[in-house]
Amino acid sequence: MNDDILQAVYRVILERKANPSEQSYTASLMAKGIDKILKKLGEEATEVVIAGKGGAREEIIYETADLFFHTLVLLGYCDINPDEIYDELRRRFGMSGIAEKESRDR
């Protein structure tokens, strides 16, 4: 798996946040705040679900890319580096779902 593209997109998102432009979709989302970002993220998640139900491979890929992008926008807005997400996934890797859930409940 190649996470370089995710880091590259994340860097652009941070650049748009730091130096907003009227021409930037990302900057416009950031300017509208967390509620708009969350609304868009929810819409994209729903579109992934619909694409998954439809089963069309290309549609699933397209909509998942949108979901990843908008997730990165949320992370950028909240100053969370994707590396923190990767670290959490590494922590969970090899752990059963039941064991992972129990570790959260303590």
From Swiss-Prot:
InterPro entries: HisE, PRib-ATP_PPHydrolase-like. GO terms for biological process: L-histidine biosynthetic process. It holds the Pfam family PRA-PH. It catalyses: 1-(5-phospho-beta-D-ribosyl)-ATP + H2O = 1-(5-phospho-beta-D-ribosyl)-5'-AMP + diphosphate + H(+). One of its GO terms (molecular function) is phosphoribosyl-ATP diphosphatase activity. Belongs to the PRA-PH family. This is Phosphoribosyl-ATP pyrophosphatase.
